[in-house]
Amino acid sequence: MAEVKIFMVRGTAIFSASRFPTSQKFTKYVRALNEKQAIEYIYSQLGGKNKIKRYNIHIQEIKEVKEDEITDKTIRDLAKLDKIIM
């Protein structure tokens, strides 16, 4: 099995592009197997929750982070788990 890594994705997104476009910065922590999957997850989450098109999301930085650098409590708690029983 591949090891799940934690990535920090930083960028900008243009919200409400049709009426009054506003550009906002974002920083998200994502659990993924590689950078490509992390980017795809960001596009999916921002697009699905905020109705943003992919071409309005601009990713500026993506890097793998260690557990002690994570500020998102949910991701930090998930990183500490050894296994999940469903």
From Swiss-Prot:
Q: How does it assemble?
A: Part of the 50S ribosomal subunit. Binds 23S rRNA.
**What are the recorded Gene Ontology BP terms?**
translation
What the entry lists under HAMAP family is as follows: Ribosomal_eL20
Q: Name one GO cellular component term.
A: ribonucleoprotein complex
Which species?
A: Sulfolobus acidocaldarius (strain ATCC 33909 / DSM 639 / JCM 8929 / NBRC 15157 / NCIMB 11770)
Q: Which GO terms describe its molecular function?
A: large ribosomal subunit rRNA binding; structural constituent of ribosome
Q: What is this protein called?
A: Large ribosomal subunit protein eL20
Q: Transmembrane residues, as ranges? A: none
Q: Which family does it belong to?
A: Belongs to the eukaryotic ribosomal protein eL20 family.
Alphabetical UniProt keywords: Ribonucleoprotein, Ribosomal protein, RNA-binding, rRNA-binding
